[in-house]
């Protein structure tokens, strides 16, 4: 494994551990010790997707899990994963899961709740 691949793996691990807080590419680059441009280029090269897309998709997967496994309000889940409004969250969630959060919850909510 190259040094660059190790750096990206370390960054992915750090991102996954910090998805509960706002993550800006500038901050991630600073944390990694790279320029924003260089980090984004490396990430795309090794992961095959942009850094921003990776973060957004990970947050959406966690939000989907919360919709499925908890009774938290959609608005609270939206805020928990750093979306600036419920409207934005609903639009992005619908684009990813082909249904709005409320419908996703009704269809997938755990039997335990």
From Swiss-Prot:
Per the UniProt record, which residue ranges are transmembrane?
none
Query: What induces or represses its expression, per the UniProt entry?
Result: Part of a putative romA-ramA operon.
Something else the entry says is: Overexpression of ramA in various clinical isolates confers multidrug resistance.
Reported phenotype of the disruption mutant: Deletion in clinical multidrug-resistant isolate KP22 increases sensitivity to many antibiotics, including tigecycline, doxycycline, minocycline, piperacillin-tazobactam, ceftazidime and levofloxacin.
The UniProt keyword set, sorted, is: DNA-binding, Transcription, Transcription regulation
According to its UniProt entry, what is the function of this protein? Transcriptional regulator. Binds to regulatory regions of target genes, including its own gene, efflux pump operon acrAB, antisense RNA gene micF, and various genes involved in lipid A biosynthesis, including lpxO and lpxL-2. Regulates expression of many genes, perhaps including its own; activates various lipid A biosynthetic genes, and as a result of activating acrAB, confers multidrug resistance. Plays a role in virulence and survival in host cells.
Could you cite one Gene Ontology molecular function of this protein? sequence-specific DNA binding
Q: Does the keyword Transcription regulation apply?
A: yes
User: What organism does the UniProt record list as the source?
Assistant: Klebsiella pneumoniae subsp. pneumoniae (strain HS11286)
PANTHER family with a match to the protein in the record: REGULATORY PROTEIN SOXS (PTHR47504:SF2), RIGHT ORIGIN-BINDING PROTEIN (PTHR47504)
Q: Which PROSITE patterns match?
A: HTH_ARAC_FAMILY_1 (PS00041), HTH_ARAC_FAMILY_2 (PS01124)
Boundaries of each HTH araC/xylS-type domain copy?
Answer: 9-107
* Classification via Pfam families: HTH_18
Q: Which gene encodes it?
A: ramA
What is the protein's given name? Transcriptional regulator RamA
Tell me the subunit arrangement: Monomer. Interacts with the C-terminus of RNAP subunit RpoA when part of class I or class II promoter complexes. Also interacts with sigma-70/RpoD in class II promoter complexes.
Per the record, DNA-binding region residues lie at 26-47, 74-97
Q: Which InterPro entries match?
A: Homeodomain-like_sf (IPR009057), HTH_AraC (IPR018060), HTH_AraC-typ_CS (IPR018062), MarA-like (IPR050959), Tscrpt_reg_AraC-type_HTH (IPR020449)
The record's section on SMART domains has: HTH_ARAC
